[in-house]
Structures are given as structure tokens and as C-alpha cells.
Amino acid sequence: MKFQARVLTLYPEMFPGFLGCSLAGQALKQGIWSLETVQIRDFALDKHHSVDDTPAGGGAGMVMRADVLAAALDSCPNDSPRLLMSPRGRLLNQAYARSLARSSGVTLVCGRFEGVDERIIEARELEEVSIGDYILSGGETAALVLLDAIVRLLPGVMGNEISAKCESFENGLLEHPQYTRPAVFEGRGIPPVLTSGHHKAIANWRQQQAESLTRQRRPDLYALYNKNRQKT
């Protein structure tokens, strides 16, 4: 079944962007997933094609109108998760990307200006999603990141399923260090265990490295990893 991505945006020319390259681009050409953009401005209600207005109660900037967004959303089938890219939303992680990859598709709403009228979130039951604790110019960049995280997990996109399962976050840990030729680079060699041919020793080394890196760099992840490990 083809994964269908639909993006509501004021800048459809930003898509597919980098998703037209590499693995995601190949999968798009092969029909593993599809991408449709919806120009929000097409659903404006006045001759000026206005999509925003001043915030109620005063304040800086402009707010995207609920009625315009509702018309744009209602023009699309309601057959997949409806997500609003928002810095106050649920933080994207690998587990969430994997759960979305199991669905039939996603409909993404890209905000601009100071955000969107809260009533559209309530009325159309949009789930807010964030890619990190920082502010972007609009939701389009975040939508591209989210789609990249999803698409690479779709069946048939990645050539090596084992590789995907060994990546950072898949088992709750950061990925272990990787090495390849040349054997020596500027005086630095490859850890001997990796060229020993002893598969169990290599697996143990990689696990130890992953745990050590996670403990040093992401103590929050390491605490969760230990908690989950104690349950099993």
C-alpha cells in the first residue's frame, strides 16, 4: 500500500525539496510513497487572498485564520493522521516516526507567522508535532524533516533492514562508532576487535560503545534505556 503524504502550505514550491533526492527521491519515483501539496491561499475568503489577521488581544505578528485553514483541510480526505508542525507540539522521536510509517499516510499543516488560530486545532483535532526546542520561519522545514524520518522507514526504501535496526535510537541507544578503509588515517587505526573476525566480540564491543556514548552524551536516553532494560 502506497504511503500518501499531503502537505498544506503557503509555499508548495518548497516540496519535495531534498526529499526528491537519495533514498526518499528514489522511493518517490518508484511509487512507494506519494506527495501532494495544497496551497492554503487558494482557500482564502476575500479578493486579497488573506490567510492571516492580527492576534486577538493585541500583540506582535499575525495569526493564520481558522476559517481559511478549515476550508483547506476539509478539501482533503480525512483518512490519515492530521498533524500541525508546531514548536509546542509532541517531540518527534524514532518511535513516533516508526508508528507514523505504519499508517496509510499523513496530512501535515505548515504554520507561518505567529502560529495558527487555536480553534482550528480543536475543531479539526490536529496533533501538534515539534522537531526540537527552537523556532523556524515556518512549518515547511519541520514537515520535510518529519517526512524524511518516516519515508526511510517504509518497506522497500532502505536496502539493508539490519542497518536500520542498528541506527541511533532504534534500541534506545545512540549508535556505536563506525570505521572503514583506510586501516590507518593520520596515525589513527581501527579498533583491533573490528578486524578480528570474532562476531560475538564485535557485537559486545559495539554494545559497550553505544552504552558509553549514550551515558556521556544523552543521560536522559540512558536513564530510560536502563529503566526499560530492568523491566525485561
Swiss-Prot record:
Q: Which Pfam families match?
A: tRNA_m1G_MT (PF01746)
Which keywords has UniProt assigned to this entry? Answer: Cytoplasm, Methyltransferase, S-adenosyl-L-methionine, Transferase, tRNA processing
- Stored InterPro entries: Alpha/beta_knot_MTases (IPR029028), tRNA_m1G_MeTrfase_C_sf (IPR023148), tRNA_m1G_MeTrfase_TrmD (IPR002649), tRNA_m1G_MTases_N (IPR029026), tRNA_MeTrfase_TRMD/TRM10 (IPR016009)
State its location(s): Cytoplasm
Kindly list the positions annotated as binding S-adenosyl-L-methionine: 111, 131-136
Q: Does the keyword Cytoplasm apply?
A: yes
Q: Report the catalytic activity.
A: guanosine(37) in tRNA + S-adenosyl-L-methionine = N(1)-methylguanosine(37) in tRNA + S-adenosyl-L-homocysteine + H(+)
Domain of life the protein comes from: Bacteria
GO cellular component, as recorded: cytosol
* Keyword S-adenosyl-L-methionine (UniProt): yes
EC number(s) recorded for this UniProt protein: 2.1.1.228
Q: Mention one GO biological process in which this protein takes part, according to its record.
A: tRNA N1-guanine methylation
Q: What Gene Ontology molecular function terms does this protein carry?
A: tRNA (guanine(37)-N1)-methyltransferase activity
Task: Give the similarity note.
Answer: Belongs to the RNA methyltransferase TrmD family.
Subunit record text = Homodimer.
* Role of this protein: Specifically methylates guanosine-37 in various tRNAs.
Which HAMAP family does this chain map to? Answer: TrmD (MF_00605)
Q: What is this protein called?
A: tRNA (guanine-N(1)-)-methyltransferase
Please state the gene responsible for encoding this protein.
Answer: trmD
